[in-house]
Structures are given as C-alpha cells and as structure tokens.
Amino acid sequence: GVEIRIEDSGEVLYRSPGVFQKYFKNPEATAETKTSDRWVRTGDAGYFDDEGHLRIIDRAKDVGKLNDDSMFAPKFLENKLKFYPEIQEAVTFGDGRDFVTAFINIDLDAVANWAERNNVAYASYQELAANPKVYDLIQDCVEKVNRSIAEDAYLATSQIRRFLVLHKELDPDDGELTRTRKVRRRIINERYSDLIEALF
C-alpha cells in the first residue's frame, strides 16, 4: 500500500515499497526529493477533506500561512476568482497577514458586454474598472468565491476580506506577468506595495 502524510508546511509526502531508491548518480536530487525515512516529497500542497479524500490545492513552494497559522494558497484562490468570465486576472495576498486581500483585473470584453447590456457608459478600461457598478459586479464574484471557500473548513480562513479592481491591466510588457500570463508576484509586490498595504 501507499502511505500519505501532510507536513506542517502543507506539502504532501508519500511512501510505498515500490518507490524508487535514488536518482542515478545524483545524490543532491535524491536528498531534495526523499527524506531519510523514505518519504517522497511531491512538491504539491494539499490536505485530507472531511471524507478522507486527498485534495491538492497548489504547489507547495507557493503556499504560505496566515497569521493564525492556517494555510494560504494564492493560486487556488486566484483560479477560483478567474473562473468568473468578468475576471481576467487576480493576485491574492495573505502570507504572514491577518486576512486575505486581492487585486483584480476585469476582463474588458466580458465587462464591456455586460456594460452595454446594462447601459453603463465608459470611454476606456480605466473608466470601466473605476465604475461603482462594475465594482459591485466584481464584488458579487468575490462573495460567491468566499461562500465556496467557507464550505471548506480547511480553507475557510482564506476568504477574501478586501479587494481592489486595478485601474490598469497587468501586462507582460510591464513585467507584471510572464509571456504565458503567469503572475510575477515579486514585481507586483514591489510595484504596488503602497496599494497592497492600503488593503490591510
């Protein structure tokens, strides 16, 4: 059989009689991947739900902790937000904090379509993103995500308490996203540090 264990960091480890012994001529990689008592590090973070099922939620290197020591999985939250067509991009903050906050980029096509159907006039992305009705639209998405997270005892503390609809789209040309549209957290933390602090 296979044994599974969750470390305090949230990383999932497993071991079984069929696990490889070591990497060929690479003791460093073996030491990084296997513990001295034969557990294999998956690099994934997860937990066992109430029914005993293993749930993988993020890469272990990306998971942090809120000040109450509960798990904070930014990509998990961001993907839940981006499920809504009105949200193009989301960046969540909470590691070492008392609660979770988020930056949100609206999806211009989806929100412009919504604006047209709801007689909301705008002349630019900035104007649309700043519209109070658009804020309410995004707040509805955030509240739905929070309700979903609240149902999960393990992640309930990661509900998004505050958010900001950014006035500009995060852009690979500005170094805020990679070319494959992955968030560059370090750059965003540096560039928007004042806005991040204002959310807390």
PLM regions: where:
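Conserved C-terminal "lid"/linker of ANL adenylate-forming enzymes
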Residues: 89, 139, 145-200
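Residue-level signal for inorganic ion chemistry
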Residues: 4, 52, 81, 102
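C-terminal boundary motif of the adenylate-forming
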Residues: 45, 84-110, 149-152
